[in-house]
């Protein structure tokens, strides 16, 4: 088997979004699984629309998710001399030609064709032009598309694709200012980089016959193509920012783990048996682009959150502390190692994202300044006050390093007072955490420690 070489080639006209990252992941997995090469190419020939910030953000996103590319990043804007060389080669071999048609002439032609209910297209009027070029017109360069031939290729996702060249006009490969066009530079670079397999979105499917025309004209080897359907939202519509089509780095800010995001995106359009959770090693072992689905996949926040929660639960305390650094939350320095472990172990089970985990840390470590109203209103204050006073005294004599001792202290109150557990636990929870839900009470007492627990009960009794 020959060396597999893939690439990801974004345009830096905007930030890397979720669909682009999925394409990059598919290319990365296929190359790495076969001990091949994976390249990153920045398609920045459209100088008027390029953004340095967007290009840097793409590189930053790659670093975050751990997609390591081979070699240097290739920037197309630095390769104009190479493109000019190949444009001249096509001109010299009479496989391309200068077209002097003005914009006004082209617009007029299109209007005439529309009036005749024909598909607007260039009419090849300069294809075999031998006369004197009109003055004042900077020509474009067009490729001579072979006439009445069938271009066919076996797409790894879509199957057999056939297009008659009569449906393709002599398209422009160099603009009037000399800059090369998208289809031309993509073909040149894929060939010169030795790309064997092109995995990309199916919005590029219509470009492929044009690129094959160029491969053949330049006697380049044609790569294998895999055109992946787009990602839709859960209503079956194109992704919007609200539904997930946002900058990849926003997911880091929202508290998603890179392992969860890679796992989630790899499963959008690809599957292996009925597995949902994949380590990177498993993805490398089982991914094959031939298994990509031919129908669109749906972006599900529920599935992403479920996966993220799974990966969050499997992080150690030390790993969580590193991951939490970008987020703001209460100071942890007063907690001893056992309290810190208990806090994060308890909260990671109840959190779906790092951002949510940071908020829950605040909910535990920040003393309540108000209490959940609907829970507070249900309390029998005549019963609650003496119970908490008694428990406060019991806590003063309890070993806070022993969670079972804390649990026994709570049960002792319930047994001695002959009351239902909820009649005591609910007001205690409200006193400690300010609300009716949250982590277990023995965990809360252990994490807060003796002084803070008693202080919170006293504050509650004042209210």
From Swiss-Prot:
Note the superkingdom of the native organism.
Answer: Bacteria
**UniProt GO molecular function:** ATP binding; glutamate-tRNA ligase activity; tRNA binding; zinc ion binding
UniProt keyword list: Aminoacyl-tRNA synthetase, ATP-binding, Cytoplasm, Ligase, Nucleotide-binding, Protein biosynthesis
Q: Name one GO biological process term.
A: glutamyl-tRNA aminoacylation
Assigned GO CC terms: cytosol
Which InterPro entries has this protein been placed in? aa-tRNA-synth_I_cd-bd, aa-tRNA-synth_I_codon-bd_sub2, aa-tRNA-synth_I_CS, aa_tRNA-synth_I_cd-bd_sf, Glu-tRNA-ligase_bac/mito, Glu/Gln-tRNA-synth, Glu/Gln-tRNA-synth_Ib_cat-dom, GluQ/Sye
Cellular compartments annotated: Cytoplasm
Residues that hold ATP according to the record: 241
Motif 'HIGH' region: chain residues: 10-20
Q: Give me the reactions it catalyses.
A: tRNA(Glu) + L-glutamate + ATP = L-glutamyl-tRNA(Glu) + AMP + diphosphate
Q: What is its EC number?
A: 6.1.1.17
Task performed by this protein: Catalyzes the attachment of glutamate to tRNA(Glu) in a two-step reaction: glutamate is first activated by ATP to form Glu-AMP and then transferred to the acceptor end of tRNA(Glu).
Q: Which family does it belong to?
A: Belongs to the class-I aminoacyl-tRNA synthetase family. Glutamate--tRNA ligase type 1 subfamily.
Q: How does it assemble?
A: Monomer.
**Protein name (database record):** Glutamate--tRNA ligase 1
Species the sequence originates in:
Helicobacter pylori (strain J99 / ATCC 700824) (Campylobacter pylori J99)
């Amino acid at each position: 088997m020959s060396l597999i070489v893939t690439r990801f080639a974004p345009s830096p006209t905007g930030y890397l979004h979720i669909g682009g990252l999925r394409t990059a992941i598919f290319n990365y997995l296929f190359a790495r699984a076969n001990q091949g090469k994976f390249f990153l190419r920045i398609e920045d020939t459209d100088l008027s629309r390029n953004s340095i910030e967007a290009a840097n953000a793409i590189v930053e996103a790659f670093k975050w998710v751990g997609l390591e590319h081979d070699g240097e990043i290739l920037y197309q804007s630095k390769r104009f001399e190479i493109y000019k060389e190949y444009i001249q080669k096509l001109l010299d071999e009479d496989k391309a030609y200068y077209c002097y048609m003005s914009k006004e002439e082209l617009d007029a032609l299109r209007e005439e064709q529309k009036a005749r209910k024909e598909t607007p297209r260039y009419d090849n009027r300069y294809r075999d032009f031998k006369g004197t070029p009109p003055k004042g017109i900077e020509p474009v360069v067009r490729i001579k598309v072979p006439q009445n031939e069938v271009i066919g290729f076996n797409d790894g996702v879509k199957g057999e694709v056939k297009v008659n060249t009569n449906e393709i006009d002599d398209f422009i490969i160099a603009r009037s200012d000399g800059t090369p066009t998208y289809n031309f530079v993509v073909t040149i670079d894929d060939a010169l980089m030795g790309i064997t397999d092109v995995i990309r979105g199916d919005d590029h499917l219509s470009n492929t016959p044009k690129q094959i025309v160029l491969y053949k004209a330049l006697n380049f080897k044609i790569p294998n193509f895999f055109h992946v359907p787009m990602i839709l939202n859960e209503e079956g519509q194109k992704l919007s920012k609200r539904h997930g089509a946002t900058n990849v780095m926003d997911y880091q800010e929202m508290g998603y783990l890179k392992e969860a995001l890679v796992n989630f995106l790899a499963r959008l359009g690809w599957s292996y048996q009925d597995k949902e959770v994949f380590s990177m090693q498993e993805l490398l072992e089982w991914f094959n682009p031939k298994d990509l689905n031919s129908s669109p996949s749906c972006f599900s926040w529920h599935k992403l959150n479920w996966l993220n929660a799974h990966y969050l639960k499997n992080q150690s305390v030390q790993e969580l502390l590193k991951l939490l650094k970008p987020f703001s939350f209460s100071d942890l320095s007063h907690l001893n190692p056992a309290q810190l472990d208990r806090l994060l172990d308890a909260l990671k089970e109840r959190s779906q994202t790092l951002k949510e985990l940071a908020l829950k840390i605040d909910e535990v470590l920040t003393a309540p300044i108000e209490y959940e109203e609907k829970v507070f209103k249900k309390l029998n204050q005549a019963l609650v006050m003496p119970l908490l006073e008694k428990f406060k005294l019991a806590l003063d004599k309890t070993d806070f390093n022993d969670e079972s001792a804390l649990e026994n202290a709570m049960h002792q109150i319930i047994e001695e007072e002959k009351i239902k557990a909820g009649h005591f636990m609910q007001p205690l929870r409200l006193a400690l955490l300010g609300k009716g839900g949250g982590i277990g009470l023995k965990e809360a007492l252990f994490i807060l420690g003796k002084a803070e627990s008693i202080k919170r009960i006293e504050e509650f009794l004042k209210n």
